[in-house]
C-alpha cells in the first residue's frame, strides 16, 4: 500500500508543470554547493535556537547513505571479495553540465573503493581536471567512457551525462572481464539493454 501510494504521489509530482525541474528520481546522493550546505546550515541554526530538526537530520542522514549505496551493492554482488577488482566510474561531477565536485557522490565512492583495495579508472566529460586537483593521481583517468572499461569487473554510473545514455553494450562487454556488472546510480538503464552485463540499480 505504501509503495503504491508513493508511486501515485511521484506520478502526480512528475505531471505538475511547476515541478518538472525537480529531482524526484532515486539517485546516489545529492551534492553541489547548495543542498548539503543549506541543510547543514538550517540544522545548525535550529539547534542554536533550541530546536531539533528531526526531518532535516533524517534528510542529511539519508543523503549520506545514498552516497554509500553504490559501494555496498558492489561489495554484496561480489560476496565481499573486492580487493584487486578493477572498476570504471562514469561521471565525477555532482550533476551534468558542470565540473563542480563539491559534495559529489563520486568522491565518497572513490574513497571507499580505494580503501577496499580496488583499482579505479574514471571518466567525466568536463570534471577530470577538478578531480585531479582534489585527489591527484590516486586513480587513473580514461580518455572516454570506453577507455575506462578495459579489463574492468564493474561500471559505476554516477553522473547522468547525455553521452552515457546510449553506449554500445556489445563493445563494452567484450572489453570487460567475465561476468561484468553495471551499478546504475541514476536508474537510467534497463537490464534488457545491457546484452548480458549484470545490472544493479538504486531502489
What positions do the PLM features span?
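Structural/interface elements that position substrates and couple domains in central-metabolism enzymes
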Residues: 1, 8-203
